[in-house]
């Protein structure tokens, strides 16, 4: 698998650190909750992923995701500003936005998901999480999250706890 979490090493997070972490988390949530037609290019979903970060006047200079397989970085799935690779059902890939500010620091969060048929709209696709490793709740500004985002995060963290990988809940 290919998973990344950022943590604060000692001390208490500043307001700016929480803001940056939460923007990157919102980017993952925007992607995880995206619904799109089959054969949508990876660049379209990449744009969805970047929206929370764009809205803060920031960006990152790498792709949002790549195919994941035996060699970790695999073809057939690519989320980037230049990707003309169409997303197909049953393709496994990463979702890994980040923010990096010179002289300040950076945050990168990464999950692995599979592209699957939407359960209600059979002509649409969506992402299903394959990796359950909790996020650092001391770095999240919950006031920045919508109700839908908070619900997704809570359900995700409960599943992480069930699997023994939550930093919020004890299993």
Name these PLM-found stretches.
Residues 1-171:
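Active-site neighborhoods and metal-handling regions in enzymes and metal-associated proteins
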């Amino acid at each position: 698998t290919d998973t990344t979490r950022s943590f604060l090493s000692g001390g208490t997070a500043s307001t700016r650190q929480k803001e940056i972490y939460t923007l990157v988390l919102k980017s993952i949530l925007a992607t995880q909750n995206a619904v799109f037609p089959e054969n949508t290019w990876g660049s379209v979903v990449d744009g969805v992923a970047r929206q929370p970060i764009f809205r803060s006047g920031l960006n990152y200079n790498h792709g949002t995701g790549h195919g994941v397989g035996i060699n970790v970085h695999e073809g057939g799935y690519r989320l980037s500003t230049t990707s003309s690779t169409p997303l197909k059902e049953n393709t496994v890939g990463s979702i890994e936005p980040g923010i990096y500010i010179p002289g300040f620091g950076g945050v990168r969060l990464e999950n692995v998901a599979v592209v699957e048929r939407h359960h209600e709209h059979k002509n649409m696709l969506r992402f299903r999480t394959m990796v359950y490793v909790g996020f650092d709740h001391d770095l999240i500004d919950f006031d920045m999250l919508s109700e839908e985002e908070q619900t997704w995060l809570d359900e995700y963290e409960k599943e992480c706890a069930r699997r023994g990988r939550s930093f919020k809940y004890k299993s």
